[in-house]
A protein has these predicted regions:
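Short, low-complexity N-terminal intrinsically disordered segments enriched in polar/charged residues
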Residues: 18-67, 71, 75
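A solvent-exposed, acidic/Ser-Thr-rich amphipathic alpha-helical stretch
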Residues: 75-121
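Hydrophobic pocket/interface hotspot
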Residues: 61, 72-74, 81, 93, ...
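Short, cysteine-centered beta-strand-loop-beta hairpins and adjacent loop/turn segments enriched
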Residues: 140-149
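Short beta-strand edge/turn micro-motifs at domain boundaries
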Residues: 21-24, 149-176
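Positively charged n-region of N-terminal signal peptides that target proteins for export
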Residues: 1-4, 18
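A short hydrophobic beta-strand element
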Residues: 128-139
């Protein structure tokens, strides 16, 4: 009887140590839904893991800002670029974008540092999926010989490798 109990215990422990077999899922070909976006009409649209290749494009875009390479920045945005600023302005088009950068760069010498990034894609029914990068950055500006630090979260919409829209949310850091 002791041998029988010992054998059952041994077999039970061996079976429990085996890795579980991978189950085939009828949904295994589908993307993982990580959240939802709601359209203006209230329609729920899947938010799925995004294309991480847009991270390289975004890092190149930030480097162009730090290098003050306005021509390169303009090459990376669509003609109809829309920038929704932290103070509720909407900058529309390359011309306005260029003018703002040409004034801002010499005025405050901003430096960008990327802190984090995440990509996602909105699955749109009967339309083209929208690819987004959400990123946290720090900007250090020098105004009147004093440094000012700002933290921003940006939602950046990509069409291919071109930036179509940017929404900026900001928190100013206290002066030190």
């Amino acid at each position: 009887m002791k041998k029988l109990i010992l054998s059952i215990a041994l077999i039970g422990s061996l079976v429990s140590c085996q890795a579980p077999a991978e189950k085939e899922s009828e949904h295994s070909h589908e993307s993982t839904v990580i959240g939802y976006e709601f359209s203006d009409e209230g329609e729920k649209q899947n938010l799925i893991v995004g294309d991480v290749s847009i991270i390289d494009t975004y890092m190149e875009f930030i480097q162009a800002h730090n290098d003050r390479d306005i021509d390169k920045i303009m090459d990376m945005v669509q003609d109809s670029i829309l920038i929704k600023t932290q103070d509720a302005q909407e900058l529309k088009g390359k011309l306005i974008h260029r003018q703002v950068l040409e004034e801002w760069f010499p005025e405050s010498n901003p430096i960008w540092t990327v802190r984090w990034m995440a990509t996602n894609t909105v699955e749109v029914k009967d339309g083209e999926n929208r690819h987004w990068l959400t990123t946290g950055i720090e900007i250090i500006e020098t105004l009147d010989e004093k440094e000012r630090k700002r933290e921003q979260i940006l939602d950046v919409n990509f069409v291919g490798k071109m930036i179509k829209e940017v929404s900026i949310y900001e928190r100013s850091k206290p002066l030190e």
